[in-house]
Structure formats: structure tokens, C-alpha cells
């Protein structure tokens, strides 16, 4: 893990409550901690001039959606991002999807879900229940985009939006 990632990760508060969507008030407590962690991550990214995603959720915090973007050669590539919180959360990490990239890379599952099994899922398992959505973005989606998006651009598979 590079120093930039380590410093970004240290700035994201850890979650303390082990709760999933079925856990009532405990889930609401965890959801509050997740929002605080996401806000801290976004503020840290903006301060570091590395702002790259925007997220919101339904009222129960079980369906998340937003935008993420990547700059390549001074051109912005923007994508819809979405995921559901699994019933077994936080033991099971959310499966983050970029639907418009579905089928465009081998490192993706059906529906545009990005492949995180080799690198991120073991890290998530070791850090359950401390990791949350902000950690999944910092250690999962961010590195995935850093590898996959430039490759897709260079191959001419994706184009910037007009």
C-alpha cells in the first residue's frame, strides 16, 4: 500500500458498531458512523485535491448510489456508482457496481460489479466491523479505477462524455 493510500485511510474514522440492516437501532448507530466516515473521507479528498466520488443513500441506508470520476490526461471520465448493503453486512463487503462498464473488462462481474476478491476482500475480512463504505471506496473502488480506467481508455473502450 502506497503512502498516499495509507494517509487517506488513517483519516477515515473506523466504525465501532457491528450491525447490519436487520439490527434496528444498532444499524442506525452504524449508519451514522458510516456517514461520518464518508464525510471525513470526502473532506480529506477535497483538501488534498483528490475529490473523486459523491454518494447518497435511501432512508434506511441499504441502497447507495452516486457518481465517481477519474481524470486521465486532463480529461474527466464520470460513472454512475451503486451498491446495496448485503444482509450479512458488515461481515460481507458491499459489491460496488459501475453499471455502464458492464462487460467492458474481465475484472468485473455481471451487472457491472467490480472484482475485489483477490486484494480487497481479505483486507475487509481482517478489519470487520471497523471498515465501512468509505474504506471500501478508498481500498476497493479507488485502486480498481486507477488500474482499469486508464486501460479501458487506452484500448478505446470508453470515451469521455460530451
UniProtKB/Swiss-Prot annotation:
GO terms for molecular function: UFM1 conjugating enzyme activity; UFM1 transferase activity. The keyword Metal-binding does not apply. The keyword Calcium does not apply. The active site is at 115 (glycyl thioester intermediate). Pfam families: UFC1 (PF08694). Keywords: Ubl conjugation pathway. InterPro entries: UBQ-conjugating_enzyme/RWD, Ufc1. One of its GO terms (biological process) is protein ufmylation. E2-like enzyme which forms an intermediate with ufm-1. The intermediate is formed via a thioester linkage. Belongs to the ubiquitin-conjugating enzyme family. UFC1 subfamily. Interacts with uba-5. This is Ubiquitin-fold modifier-conjugating enzyme 1. It comes from Caenorhabditis briggsae.
Amino acid at each position: 500500500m502506497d503512502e498516499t493510500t495509507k494517509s487517506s485511510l488513517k483519516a477515515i474514522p473506523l466504525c465501532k458498531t457491528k450491525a447490519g440492516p436487520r439490527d434496528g437501532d444498532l444499524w442506525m448507530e452504524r449508519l451514522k458512523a458510516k456517514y461520518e466516515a464518508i464525510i471525513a473521507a470526502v473532506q480529506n479528498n477535497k483538501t488534498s485535491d483528490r475529490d473523486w466520488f459523491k454518494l447518497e443513500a435511501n432512508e434506511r441506508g441499504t441502497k447507495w448510489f452516486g457518481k465517481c470520476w477519474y481524470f486521465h490526461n486532463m480529461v474527466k471520465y464520470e460513472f454512475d456508482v451503486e451498491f446495496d448493503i448485503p444482509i450479512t453486512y458488515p461481515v460481507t463487503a458491499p459489491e460496488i457496481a459501475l453499471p455502464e462498464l458492464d462487460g467492458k473488462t474481465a475484472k468485473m462481474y455481471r451487472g457491472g460489479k467490480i472484482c475485489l476478491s483477490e486484494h480487497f476482500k481479505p483486507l475487509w475480512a481482517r478489519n470487520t466491523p471497523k471498515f465501512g463504505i468509505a474504506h471500501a471506496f478508498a481500498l476497493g473502488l479507488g485502486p480498481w479505477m486507477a488500474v482499469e480506467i486508464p486501460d479501458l481508455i487506452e484500448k478505446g473502450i470508453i470515451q469521455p462524455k460530451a
